[in-house]
Regions:
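Alpha-helical support elements that line or immediately flank enzyme active sites
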Residues: 4-75, 134-148, 173-212
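Residues that form or immediately flank small-molecule/cofactor binding pockets and catalytic motifs
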Residues: 20, 47, 86-88, 161
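Phosphate/diphosphate-binding loops
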Residues: 63, 70-126
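A residue-level signal for beta-strand positions that form part of recognition/binding surfaces
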Residues: 12, 80, 153
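Short acidic, glycine/serine/threonine-rich loops at helix termini
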Residues: 26-28, 51-57, 92-98, 118-120, ...
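General beta-strand structural signal in soluble alpha/beta enzymes
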Residues: 15-17, 41-44, 81-85, 116-119, ...
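Glycine-rich loop/linker segments at domain edges
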Residues: 1-4, 101-188
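Short amphipathic alpha-helical surface micro-motifs
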Residues: 24, 62, 85-88, 97-99, ...
Length: 212
């Protein structure tokens, strides 16, 4: 479960947590406590299965721990506190893997040569609203959602359209990112073209790769 040990003292704070975002988490805790980042002594513990859940731009459970520690200290109490999110807490306050819809219209000849490939993806952005938006979202397109298609190693004339709907479901990254859905779609479609043109799928892929 998400958890940490926090000890707020007169001269700073000690924090023990399995973090994947130490610098951001340290700064978030410092901000809540009114400290400088260097006053937060961060001890990184073994994270177990982090899978990106312990790399949250909002530093959610650690910021919460800092708020609790601040109130605990203000009440006159001293000593370390351990904060643990239950499974119910995590489901209620966590983030979800966004759903994606792919639609492709492909034109190819009898030999399997692709003449046109129109590809549309619809899905929530996991980068918009995070500190990474400035360099990972260009012209309104989340780069993490198009990887595996815009940079496909296959010689394909792909025309890609992306739509990011705004929904109230909180989403963020998961184990791996865009390739988890784009690779499945691309490879499935390549298989379909190979089968429709009567070619061995491996040989067809080798032809699409050219000299790569």
């Amino acid at each position: 479960p998400l958890n940490c040990l926090i000890d707020l003292r007169d001269d700073g704070c000690k924090l023990h947590a399995g973090s994947q975002f130490q610098t951001i988490d340290q700064a978030a805790v410092a901000k809540v406590l009114g400290l400088k980042p260097e006053q937060v002594e961060f001890h990184t513990m073994m994270a177990g299965g982090g899978f990106g859940r312990r790399a949250v731009p909002s530093s959610d459970y650690l910021a919460e721990a800092a708020q609790i520690a601040k109130a605990w200290r203000a009440s006159g109490a001293k000593g370390p506190l351990k904060v643990v999110w239950s499974r119910e807490d995590d489901i209620r306050g966590g983030y979800y893997r966004p759903m994606h819809l792919h639609r492709a219209e492909i034109g190819f000849d009898a030999e399997g040569k692709v003449l046109g490939w129109k590809h549309t993806i619809v899905g929530q952005s996991i980068i918009t609203g995070t500190p990474f938006e400035a360099f990972m979202v260009k012209d309104g397109v989340d780069a993490s959602m198009t990887e595996g298609i815009v940079d496909t190693p296959y010689a394909l004339p792909v025309h890609l359209e992306v739509h990011h709907p705004t929904l109230n479901v909180p989403v963020l990254w998961w184990r791996s990112v865009g390739h988890t859905h784009t690779a499945f779609v691309m490879e499935t479609l390549v298989d379909e073209i190979a089968r429709a043109s009567g070619q061995d799928p491996v040989a067809y892929r080798r032809a699409l790769l050219g000299d790569k």
